[in-house]
């Protein structure tokens, strides 16, 4: 084949790949907005609708009802470009989550004993239940995976709380500044901090193949990275922000470039350490969480693009890995029901018990339990890490996705019932519910 022919073939391949990527992106963005709008219309979070739409675009529905069309859209081109886009979006989203993290909740003195008890019970009980479930169920539902590693990721998925979406649900019910709201958001903040640290440690442990030496080295490198980020990178970034920030709370092009470069370099650093690049994005957000003008400017200029473009890509990426049809036996659905029951009992029951122990009423304790049970996007991030590591099977992945959806869907109806009983929270009218996204600004 001549050089000209090779060049022509290369151009044709590139154009063909671009065609299918653009087709996928058009479908994902449009249907993501439709799914989100439907969810908002019925009084749910926009994130719930986008997650469900992502699953419906995968083999669970689209692939089952129209396999030829599904393969044409999603299997005609190599999956790597869409995978890379989803991971870039996830890194940016993790940066955004880090930016929005409010550490002042961790120092709130009001009802401190209740906060500590609720956070502890809401983390420890579901983690232990998830660990037991994952360990004993692994031979049946993840036979090819490392049994202990699989159990650790299931336990982490059960113990996490979706702080950003929980905060927005609380805003809809106007309870963020009430004593109950302060207790919940503070407990969820502690839960989230420990949850992300736990995920980083478990990821490092799994990648070290449970070698004490390799694991210790990864932890040492991770600690050095965190220290260098806080004591060296943060002061440098603050100087650059002071020099490059725009007028008011605007984000100049130069500062935007610096932030994006810092996010990607941080992701590269955590990858080189031996944990996933998404942790680098989160760490960079945490470094700048107190730069309020930067946070506002980022959310206004870039946050909405991440929400509208990248987030549905990640949900669809998750949906393509989810196959509800793979749960093709009563035994598998039985395991799924048990997982959902343990997840709800562990988080709701643990937080309810801790709240009652702290002297709160039954109604207050129920509201705390249902709010702390919200998982949404945070759990999807955890289980995607576990799936990429090969420590959970597709069936377990599907079960955990369903659990993430159910645990989030039941939050708003539960609050509509229990908050009025304790004289709090005007349930939002369905037609006026503000769209909310996990880790992203309302759009």
Please report, for each region that a protein language model flagged, where it lies by residue.
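Short, strongly hydrophobic alpha-helical membrane anchors
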Residues: 1-17
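Membrane-interface junctions of multi-pass transporters
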Residues: 12, 57-114, 242-337
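Membrane-interface segments at loop-to-transmembrane junctions
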Residues: 41-44, 78, 109-121, 178-190, ...
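Structural signature of hydrophobic alpha-helical transmembrane segments
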Residues: 12-27, 78-95, 145-161, 218-228, ...
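Transmembrane alpha-helices that form the ion-translocation and gating core
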Residues: 30-41, 64, 103-173, 318-403, ...
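Transmembrane alpha-helical segments of multi-pass membrane transport proteins and ion-pumping complexes
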Residues: 25-37, 55, 59, 63-64, ...
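Flexible hinge motifs at transmembrane-helix junctions and intramembrane kinks/re-entrant loops
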Residues: 34-49, 55, 265-280, 403-404
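Small-residue-rich segments of transmembrane alpha-helices in multi-pass membrane proteins
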Residues: 50-62, 117-131, 153, 186-200, ...
